[in-house]
Amino acid sequence: MLETSQTIPELVNWTREREFSLSLSTERLAFLLAIAIYNNERLDGEMLETDLIDIFRHISNTFEQSAETISTRANNSINELVKQRFLNRFSSEFTEGLSIYRLTPLGVGVSDYYIRQREFSALRLSVQLSIVADEIQRASEAAEEGGDEHYWRKNVFAPLKYSVAEIFDSIDLSQRMMDENQQHIKEEIAELLTKDWQTAIASCERLLDETSGNLRELQDTLNAAGDKLQSQLLRIQDCVIGHDNLYFVEQLIVDLQAKLDRIISWGQQAIDLWIGYDRHVHKFIRTAIDLDKNRVFSQRLRQSIHHYFDHPWFLWIAQAERLIDLREEELTLREEEALGELPEELQYESLADLHEQIVETMQSLLIEYRLQNTPIDLSEVLTAQLKQYPLAKHFDIARIIIDQAVRLGLAQDDLNGIYPNWRSINENGAEVQAHVIDKY
């Protein structure tokens, strides 16, 4: 940051004596930014009161305020900006009623913060570093030639102090603006994750990737120029060693080296912090969607299916196989009665009969478990049972078995909070996720 020769008590007393105060509402800030942009478009940098009123009229329309009091509110806003030293007002007996306004350094600084500093890019950083490299190169060559104190102040100290140092401060301020932008992106991601998940995930990926790419590109630019700049500063530092009268140059070199180190170091640290945040967001999404330990999404899905006809919804499927429509629209219904007997393998078998058979099987397993203290592996039970039935009945069979398994007992791993693995139970890709039942 810029150095100051004043102490904290001196600055505090100076501020108190002049009664400095800053207070800008959203409307007043928009007015100041509009004035700054309009001022940049003028060659003389001077504005009349009528110009400011026209600008305020546009601001008032944007904020949907009353048009009847524009003149009064415009004068109040102009006077407030003058009072807070954002604008300077000039008038004389020759220009009575036609005051001239110019932005003060404070007005330029505030508007520059909101306008120019947000235009931070790798191209701008590259141009700034190129200018710095040229200035330091000329200063190092002048230092090696040597001269009296006036020569050093003019050819070495001045370029480093008023060009290189100010560009370093500009880069440092831009980094702080990017810090603020990262916080804004984090808030935006947090808001997205509380809304529509389908849109949120895609938007989060885009924001994370864009920010990571920007940080990496800017840091690569800094790293490429950092070593060269440090070597040039060391050349100048070597030239002032042993010259006590050039202490001001040596102190400036130390300050510049510290600034450059701080800029490069914080750039890398910002990347590391963002990578950690990126991983945290992805871990949160995976945990919330894939693991779902509390079965919150599963419960909501069951409720949505149950109330589908009252509240219809769309189902998004990722990498789904093509669904085959088995209906033949050209076929007509046959109203003839079916005569004869069905083959034995096609005869209807009610779920009640299946339920009784499976209950008997589970009871035999229960007796074996109680007699021999043998754990029941639910995946093996399902695999063995499903082999005895056609694929069309697998879902009902599995549902009945699982229902009985819940009544049989508990798994110690469930009590320990261990997450079970998925295991295949048929040749068509069906899987089950359950621990071995070992506590009756």
UniProtKB/Swiss-Prot annotation:
Residues 208-236 are annotated as: Leucine-zipper. GO terms for molecular function: calcium ion binding. Keywords: Calcium, Cell cycle, Cell division, Chromosome partition, Cytoplasm, DNA condensation. Gene3D superfamilies: Chromosome partition protein MukF, middle domain (1.20.58.590), MukF, C-terminal domain (1.10.225.40), Winged helix-like DNA-binding domain superfamily/Winged helix DNA-binding domain (1.10.10.10). GO terms for biological process: cell division; chromosome condensation; chromosome segregation; DNA replication. Interacts, and probably forms a ternary complex, with MukE and MukB via its C-terminal region. The complex formation is stimulated by calcium or magnesium. It is required for an interaction between MukE and MukB. This is Chromosome partition protein MukF. The gene is mukF.
